[in-house]
Amino acid sequence: MTPQLGAITKLLEKFTFSAWVVDDDQTIIYINPVMEELFGNLAGEKTSIIYDCGSYEVVSKQIGDAGESSELSISDIPFRCFSCKLDLGEEGRFRVEYFEDISEQKHIYNNMTQALAKINSETKIAKIIQNSILPINDTYWNTIAYNSMYMPADDLGGDFYDLMKLNDDEYLMYIADVAGHGIQSSLLTVFMRERVITNRKAALAGTNELLSKLVLDFCALDLDSMMYVTMVFCKYNKALRELTISNAGHNCFPLIIRNNGRSETIPMSGMPISKIAEGMDYDEETIIINPGDRLILFTDGIVEEVDSTTGQSFGTEGVRKLAEKYHEYDGSYLARKIMDESKKYALISAKDDRSIIIADILA
């Protein structure tokens, strides 16, 4: 197996969902342990063998080279398979396909099939997949009005974010930034998001406990020492009116806008998720937050936009001023305003992904 393909299969080996790599002839050249446990060792077989295996029933057409998606039913649990073309030049052309349980996140993917059917470029396919795993702007659980924007610097970005319900009183939100760009970084965003979902119950004990678990999962990948992920977690307890925060090297600190328009920054230190973070402890900070207050999370691509004449960056101060000025506007408007203002602040772009979350506490 070639070095580039070997690095990708090494990452797929750690996934907790099924994945394989196939060549242009639809021959399976690699199958990860999870998929092998379900289907057996299919290396060397054609991809069509999955459709004749046991109780797996195809409910939509087989994936094609254009990056279409297909749904499978496994014991009445819906799974969706995604395919991304991978052109490694002289090493050959391949497809990476993975099968993910979509019973909890199905609403996120409702437009995936139609979007992917028209796309031929491998980077555009990966970009659509990456964007589609992000939460939609909506009101969640009658508790949080959630609005976000994501603008990657390149076709494949490294920012990602999500929110999820832990129980009837507690809700988890986070934003993260993977170092670098390209196929490896985009695959790592999918992996880290999946690990958050798998380990989310650890946040009930503490957001710092969740970070410690993610560090272990990351280190198990044995990636290059230059690879790292910054993350900030915020757990909202509706019953106690508390927001508990842990930071793993994310240099854009959470910003709280109170219902009277006053702003508060929550500065916290912490090591980025990386090899050198193994065994380190993370801190927690808990603040009071009430209905009518607003939580803003963002990545450094926004604050690093630089004025080409003065050399000054847009900075967290630029975010704070806009958040205070437009605190009475809805989150969707504010997210767009901050994005637009940071972009036109300079003629020269910082060339980094830009993401922002506006979470209004409703109850």
Where do the PLM segments sit?
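Active-site-proximal, acidic helix/loop segment immediately C-terminal to a metal-coordinating Asp/Glu
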Residues: 39-40, 183-203, 293-349
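PAS and PAS-like sensory/regulatory domains
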Residues: 70-84, 227-229
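Terminal output helix/cap of sensory domains in signal transduction proteins
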Residues: 46-75, 339-342
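Sensory modules in modular signal-transduction proteins
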Residues: 1-33, 37
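PAS and related sensory helical modules
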Residues: 29, 36-53, 190, 208, ...
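Sensory coupling linkers of modular signal transduction proteins
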Residues: 87-117, 180
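… and, occasionally, acidic/histidine-rich disordered N-termini of signaling adaptors
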Residues: 77, 111-296, 347-363
